[in-house]
Amino acid sequence: MMNHDTESHVKISRTIYRGVSPSTTRLESRVRELEDILDLERDARVRAERHAADLSYQVDALSERLDEAGGSTTQTQELLKRREMEINKLRKDLENANASLELAETSMRRRHQTALNELSLEVENLQKQKGKAEKDKSHLIMEVDNVLGQLDGALKAKQSAESKLEGLDSQLNRLKTLTDDLQRQLTELNNAKSRLTSENFELLHINQDYEAQILNYSKAKSSLESQVDDLKRSLDDESRNRFNLQAQLTSLQMDYDNLQAKYDEESEEASNLRNQVSKFNADIAALKSKFERELMSKTEEFEEMKRKLTMRITELEDVAERERLKAVSLEKLKTKLTLEIKDLQSEIESLSLENGELIRRAKSAESLASELQRRVDELTIEVNTLTSQNNQLESENMRLKSLVNDLTDKNNALERENRQMNDQVKELKSSLRDANRRLTDLEALRSQLEAERDNLASALHDAEEALRDMDQKYQASQAALNHLKSEMEQRLRERDEELESLRKSTTRTIEELTVTITEMEVKYKSELSRLKKRYESSIADLEIQLDATNKANANLMKENKNLAQRVKDLETFLDDERRLREAAENNLQITEHKRIQLANEVEELRSAMENLERLRKHAETELEETQSRVSELTIQVNTLSNDKRRLEGDIGVMQADMDDAINAKQAAEDRATRLNNEVLRLADELRQEQENYKHAEALRKQLEIEIREITVKLEEAEAFATREGRRMVQKLQARVRELEAEFDGESRRCKDALAQARKFERQYKELQTQAEDDRRMVLELQDLLDKTQMKMKAYKRQLEEMEEVSQITMNKYRKAQQQIEEAEHRADMAERTVTVRRVGPGGRAVSVARELSVTSNRGMRATSMM
């Protein structure tokens, strides 16, 4: 009997040790979980500190850039102010985040400390209960006198165990659903990871596109600078050419005036020569008639002298000889005069020919004068067209200024969008960290539930072992049952008190858990409202930006159409200019009655040239402004590249957070597999319990009558225990439902965050398309600038050709001037010869010959001038 009692005592102590071990394991697991949570909080704080250090470094870099670009323009000052405001906001956010992290860390430490204290109190209570249970079991070894009552209690315990098993089955089903949800979340997170990787690749491609765009902008900048230099040189050349043309026009006008005066003088001399020729012919006819009359009179006198003065033959012979000498001289004069008449006739014929040539030349000069007048009219039209083109260029310059301003505004908008995207990425990071914290909290609660389930399983195992021990010790306990009835009543009261104390402790722990849950709910709700407001504001800003970008795109399309129309107009203008140049080469002389108009037009051209010079200076100033703006744009592009690098770093941090979340989910899957194994173990234990139940029923039928009195008390105690157990189970079930609801809310939040990330991705793609449109616009503007440069080169070539033509005309003018000088020299020589010959007898004929030679020389001079 004593050996049997010692064996039963050893078995009871073993069962009690097994019943206490799950609580210690639960405490150890709780401590480990708390340590893991502390490690996670520390890692999060380290990451936050690193992020704060990165932000401070970025803030320092931005401040240096702001100091470097401080005195550029008012726009940069406004940008600096905005950036400083954003930096202050970021600093405040960092300080708030650090403060919130420190508060959360202190609150978590306090909670962990309180939880450890409560767990230590529970361990002490369990140790006390263990001692009391050992005492009770040592007494129960001697006091089991009515096994039927114990068997009834075992049956009721079985029923309660079955109800507990049903509750555990429901919990298992819920846990299975939770595991399925966790698996779904794992798949969703994997998909999100794949999306994030794809987004990372897309961001890398976008980065490359931005770098290519930056290179294109730099090339466009260099090409624009070269084009501006070419335009400046072409404008200078045009101004010089126009001054040269004005000087040539004035010289040509003076030459034309001189030629007109000479032409008038020559026409007067020709009329004088004609009058002299007519007079000379009349003199010749008079001389012929006179000489004939004199001969007739001489012959009559000679016959009368023969008839009347035969006596005076000697005198008459002398007179005859004299007359004969006179006749010889007259015949000589006659021959000379005939020769001179022939020469004069030939000279008259040559003069008539020269006169016809002069008439033809006068007609050609009149036609040239009409053509020059037409050219002057065309030049006036060209001047008007140039003024209109100048106005158009001024309007185009203003539009280009507006385009540059729009581009600067777009760059500012892109910078703001990049900042907003950075803020949104930071908010998403914080939301992911919060989600990770919530997952860790859920895992901790799950571990608590697992520990409670382990406790229940250990209690069931202890109950089974106690039933087995009671079955073995039934024979030894019958003698001591009567003696132990009164003691059992006292012990039952003590057990009731212990159950009440346990109930109070459990209610206290449940209240603390409810308080923590309410705090977490309030925190999550506040965070949700804050995130919702931020996302709504970001969505509104993005919609406004989309409207602005759409308007800008419409304006750019309109400007493209206007520029295409302008290109067509410029091409038509170039064709007109070429035609006018061809007409101008054929029309270089101007008539006299249009000379005043030409002078007025020349003055107008001078004023137009002055206006063009002023416009050129204005264009140079505007080009300098555009160069400064291009430099500002390059600075902004550099800032955008730095922001891109910062975004890449943030994406790397997000990927690390995603890897941590995936590892946590893998740990959750491992826990789910462990739960399944524990479910299988519980099923095996239920089978063993059913077998024991069959044995107990066989014994119960034999010992029903002996244990009715004790069964009443045991039923009351068991009813109390079942009521308390049901309450605990209901509370735990309610807690599990709340945790499930929180988990569903967290999953919905994750889905909303993913949807918002997709929205941001779409917005980023839209911004990328806008950037491509801007790049196309820049390329089109570059093409237009190239075309204008080609046109300016064509204008330059035309001006060079005009200069060559003007040089040719100047050479012709110089040759004509030399010929005129030679003709004047010849005229002077002829006048000298005439004065010399006038002294002699044939002065009149010599003067006529001189006049004819002068007219011939002047005709030759006119032909050389033509």
From Swiss-Prot:
Keywords: Coiled coil, Cytoplasm, Disulfide bond, Motor protein, Muscle protein, Myosin, Thick filament. Residues 23-839 form a coiled coil. GO terms for cellular component: myofibril; myosin complex; myosin filament. Residues 1-22, 840-866 are annotated as: Nonhelical region. InterPro entries: Myosin_tail (IPR002928), XRCC4-like_C (IPR014751). The keyword Cytoplasm applies. Gene3D superfamilies: 1.20.5.340, 1.20.5.370, Vasodilator-stimulated phosphoprotein. It is found in: Cytoplasm, Myofibril. PANTHER family: CINGULIN-LIKE PROTEIN 1-RELATED, MYOSIN-6-LIKE. Paramyosin is a major structural component of many thick filaments isolated from invertebrate muscles. Homodimer. Belongs to the paramyosin family. This is Paramyosin. The lineage of its organism: Eukaryota, Metazoa, Spiralia, Lophotrochozoa, Platyhelminthes.
